[in-house]
UniProtKB/Swiss-Prot annotation:
Taxonomy of the source species: Archaea, Methanobacteriati, Methanobacteriota, Methanomada group, Methanobacteria
Protein name: Protein MTH_538
Gene3D superfamilies in the record: Hypothetical protein MTH538
Organism: Methanothermobacter thermautotrophicus (strain ATCC 29096 / DSM 1053 / JCM 10044 / NBRC 100330 / Delta H) (Methanobacterium thermoautotrophicum)
Coiled coil: none
Subunit text: Monomer.
Functional summary from the UniProt entry: Not known. Could have a role in a phosphorylation-independent two-component response regulator system.
Names of required cofactors: Mg(2+)
Keyword Magnesium: yes
Domain of life: Archaea
Swiss-Prot/TrEMBL keywords: Magnesium
Record InterPro entries: ThsB_TIR-like_sf
Amino acid sequence: MTAEIRLYITEGEVEDYRVFLERLEQSGLEWRPATPEDADAVIVLAGLWGTRRDEILGAVDLARKSSKPIITVRPYGLENVPPELEAVSSEVVGWNPHCIRDALEDALDVI
């Protein structure tokens, strides 16, 4: 992949955010941070749902209005995500760097 993807990633004061950034770097994906409005895709860290629900809902709403893919990442070590997130997600993935990259490439139709 040669194109740089603009990503909005939900942030928080939890370890999940730091670990996700490490996994994203390991994926080999070329990306840069963006606002929800300017992003090519929105990444929702489901582990932040309890503390950042309003922020997440705002980003999801913007993504849906703009027909941007929403990739939800399961809480670290868990299989389930909140049903509200699963219903609006383009894909739900775990923490494998290659799965994260593949989900983004598939959602954005990148070869």
